Amino acid sequence: MIKTLLTTLKQDKETFEVPKSVQDAIPIRRLWPDGIFQFGSKFSKTLRFSDINYAIASKEDKTAMFLDYSELLNALDAGSATKITINNKRVNRENFEREILLPRRDDTLDGYRAEYNAMLMGKVTDSSNSVAQERYITLSVHRKSVEEARTFFDRVVHDVTSRLNHLDSHSEELDAVERLRVLHDFYRAGEETEYRLDLRECMRRGHSFKDAVCPDSLEFKKDHFVMGNKYGRVLFLKEYASYIKDSMINELTGLNRNLMLSIDIIPVPTDEAVRELQNRLLGVETNVTNWQRRQNSNNNFSAIVPYDLEQQRKETREMLDDLTTRDQRMLFAVVTLVHLADSKKELDSDTEALQSIARKHLCQLAPLSWQQADGLVTALPLGLRRISALRTLTTEALAVLMPFKAQEIRHQGGVYYGQNVISRNLILANRKELLNGNGFVLGVSGSGKSFTAKRELAALALSTDDDIICIDPESEYRPIIEGLGGEVVNISATSPNHINAMDMEQGYGDGENPVVLKSEFLLSLCEQLMGSRQLSAKEKSIIDRCTAQCYHGYIRGGYQGSVPTLRDFHAELLRQPEPEARDVALAIELFTEGSLNTFAKPTNVDTSSRILCYDIRDLGKQLLPMGMLVVLDSVFNRIIRNRRLGRSTWVYIDEIYLLFQHEYSANFLFTLWKRVRKYGACCTGLTQNVDDLLQSHTARTMLANSEFLVMLNQASTDRAELARLLNISDNQLSYITNVDFGRGLIKCGSAIVPFMDHFPKNNLYRLMSTKPSEADAAA
């Protein structure tokens, strides 16, 4: 027998003690707050790791993921054991509803909240949303003391974490309270919200931590067990097919039940494995030689070597070749699965369903007879293995038991964005949790771009006290804004509503010189007003000088009195001696003294409403780019004011590509995009012209650095550009190719998830819809 296996079996050998209580059935002898458990001379540590998009990856990407996962298995320490566990946790319905449903506020919007909650509950009743999957890696090692074990775990955990990061899977170490929570949620399924454990308080009172996690009762039968009011059964993979598909583990864990599937792995040092295989091959060759000698003695000189001997020789040679030339390792593994049900009948039905999945893959999943207690301890992420049905596998053969399926987006306090196409789970994202909350919504006309923004806007309006501001160049947002009790401000050349382009709140520069930032804004504004040509160096200097002179008295007066206007700026230009100043003044005269001077007057608009929309559709082609820029600067002033009040702000900019057509306006937007994150604001840009957007280097940078993107149906040229920019695989691109309304991809942080959204056609839907017939009905 291989020395490593012999040593492992010897070390794992335990003295059997009949448990006298349910607490005794939990084999943890001692634990430390950092999450290390002790069982005899064995210590264990658990990491939780996130899922990755394996199921929807292209063939090339799957191969790359498979090889990266194989490298992780190859890197496992030969002096320790590893357990990979997939945990299906039934979501507590009451807790889940409390987390996602919008509470009543006894105001005029409660009717919409009721409709929104009904929509969410319609999605939640789908069985897939009642189970949440978690994945763990448990490392266990025999050491003389916890200090030695801790040193070992520090080294190995760092290596495992870095290799998981290479797979885009993020991991975290579980402390003792979190590890015990996993056990509590399994042993006391349905009572997840009742978990309360303070280790210091337990020690002070002299209580055992096992009291907080153990079930009320635990009775083991021949092929199942009864735990409290639940029935359970432990199965193990008894027979393996010669070829197993990489989807088998995902299919087994796809059952909508409380279950845990664990893969116990014992790595073997390569030198030992090679020596063992060489001895095995020598034994097979000896058997072949002896057989041929017997045939020769019977004068049978043409006899063919028996099939079984030939197969043994072939398989041994192949495995030896794998180890010596293909960087494979020999590993011992056993797969165990424990599942729970509410009744014996349901348990038997679930067992048959699991066995049917295994049979489909030409494998045999069998219940453990009279070993249910040992099997339960083995299947849980404790770090123990009491089942000896080990199978010799190479790295490749073990990597086929792939624990990855699809990424999920489920943030605490997240907003609903649709359902994951792969798992059918709700996508709940909290943009405030991301490195920056800014984002884009991209899609061709009719793909659901505006609807997506309005759905998020409505959810925020109904569930938070955050301020919401829209810049609407198409007059599409009026129904939803007014329906939610907001204010729509019409701005045009003939409108009585005016916004001063030179408004400046105290704190505009965020501790820096506010005139510098305002100068950049006026440079971008003048560039827009002067047409397609770029400003010369002289003109830039003149504009900067005039800006400082306009604001000198206002800032020295403590931001009191009349705010300068574009008329003041125009007059200041005329006072300059340079002829270039008069050229700039003449170029902007139409917008200061002429018929398009709506932004050259003092602000007379009340913008204090929590939900505000600037309707700029009637500005016309001449004023629209300038109008978007001025409104954006006004919004920035509002964001600064909200920051002082400790209030978050959400900004939606439709047809954002218009701002990227000129260098200075693009740079102003880029600066704003970076600054608002510090002020507790999130900006969202919407456009159907992705190709036009990406012509701007600034826009490409903003798009590539955005943590949140919603990509709906895309034109072919846009798909190619997005694929290059965001490294989207061909398989993922299929989710934004000729798809229906409300379908696409969501990029949230590092996760890219295919989604779909079927919103019921209620009153809230009619407020959000931009389809003419439905919009008319809402009106």
What are these regions (language model features)?
Residues 1-406:
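Extended, folded cores of ATP/NTP-driven motor/assembly subunits in large transport
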Residues 52, 59-78, 89, 253, ...:
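P-loop NTPase motor domains
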Residues 441:
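Hydrophobic anchor at the beta1->P-loop junction of P-loop NTPases
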Residues 449:
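Conserved lysine of the Walker
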Residues 452:
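Hydrophobic positions on the alpha1 helix immediately C-terminal to the Walker A/P-loop
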Residues 459-469:
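Post-Walker A helix-loop "phosphate-sensing" segment adjacent to the P-loop in P-loop NTPases
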Residues 485-489, 698-711:
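A short helix-turn-beta junction within AAA+ P-loop NTPase domains corresponding to the substrate/partner-engaging
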Residues 726-778:
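Conserved P-loop NTPase
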